[in-house]
Regions:
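Intrinsically disordered, low-complexity regulatory segments enriched in Ser/Thr/Pro
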Residues: 75-87
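Compact, glycine/acidic-enriched structural inserts
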Residues: 87-109
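Small/flexible residues
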Residues: 74-75, 96
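Short conserved micro-motifs at the rims of enzyme active sites and ligand-binding pockets
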Residues: 71-74, 91
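Charged, low-complexity surface segments at secondary-structure and domain boundaries
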Residues: 1-5, 84-90
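A surface-exposed partner-binding patch
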Residues: 1-70, 109-111
């Protein structure tokens, strides 16, 4: 897998996460209901939800129901969230410094 496989440069730690996750199924974060998509699903999910139209600077990487998680294209490793029904109208909210921090925060909240 190349860092620019999706037409932009993936953040370092997210790229590392994708190369380590060898499965074709989404990465389920504990029992939280949050999944991070496998690399094979990323383009399809972004096309399905028309992310390029509503939030062209962001790339969908996972979700829990209507709540979606994103990275910013050609940017740092920050993870953002937004409601899929509010894309383009509500500002993205930063929720973690990187994908590993995000996973750890979710797992800690489950305890």
């Amino acid at each position: 897998m190349k860092r620019n496989e999706f037409g932009f440069v993936l953040p370092n730690l997210y790229y590392q996460f994708l190369t380590e996750w060898k499965e074709t199924d989404p990465y389920e974060i504990g029992d939280s209901g949050i999944c991070l998509y496998a690399k094979e699903d990323l383009l399809e999910r972004n096309e399905t939800y028309q992310i390029e139209v509503d939030e062209p600077d962001f790339f969908l990487i996972g979700q829990e129901g209507d709540l979606a998680y994103f990275i910013k294209k050609n940017a740092d490793d920050s993870i953002y969230e937004n409601d899929l029904g509010a894309l383009g109208s509500l500002e993205m909210q930063k929720v973690a410094a990187n994908v590993y921090d995000f996973i750890n925060k979710i797992l800690e909240e489950e305890l």
